[in-house]
Amino acid sequence: PRNDSKGIPTETEYVLAYGKNPEWTPKKLPRTEEMDAKYGNPDNDVMPWTSDNPCAPGAKTHQGMVYAIQHPFTGEMLYPAISSCWRYEQKTMLVYMCGWCEYELKNLKDEAQRAKICGIDANEVRKDIKGIVLKNGLEESKAHAQAVLKRGQWPRFYFTRNGNGGIRRKTYLENVEGKMVTNFWPYTEVGHTDEAKKELKALFDGEIPFDTPKPTRLLQRIIQIATN
């Protein structure tokens, strides 16, 4: 804004977007170095990853994905957060957990706990859902899990705090998409009015043939997210 502006100067402009299809979704932008910097490789995995939520919403409608997973280091029974379920179906989670030590399915008669997570009455919860529990004793299971922890390249679902913390999920950099388009485009990315005026002056021998020109970078952004 100008130094002699009155009141509170405006620093935003609005671009109206129209589409024939109400289900239209803009294309994602290229990822930034800052976004990719959040991905690392603390366990010497084959590709960089970041720590992610092991759960997903929808416990009430996905009762088959709400159950206990026994911690291989502490023996604690872990459940999804209230109203949440595990990210993947049980047979997939069982495969991931067997990457730490041997596991099996067992009926824990934990209907009350699962009903609480799902937000339903205990008599409404499914009775056939088993927990993923250690197949062998805790000491044997823990020793195997500690060997995996020391070896590196941990399974997709891992345990924080050197094995003593909660469960988390790896999200690999190669599997994530670009940057989501929002309704705020900073001038550092798409330019500003002064930049647009300078571009016009360069094209029209110092003249600005029309008011409120738009910078080339803004037009490029619009084309980038809306076309192939």
PLM ranges: what are they?
Residues 1-227:
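Class I S-adenosyl-L-methionine
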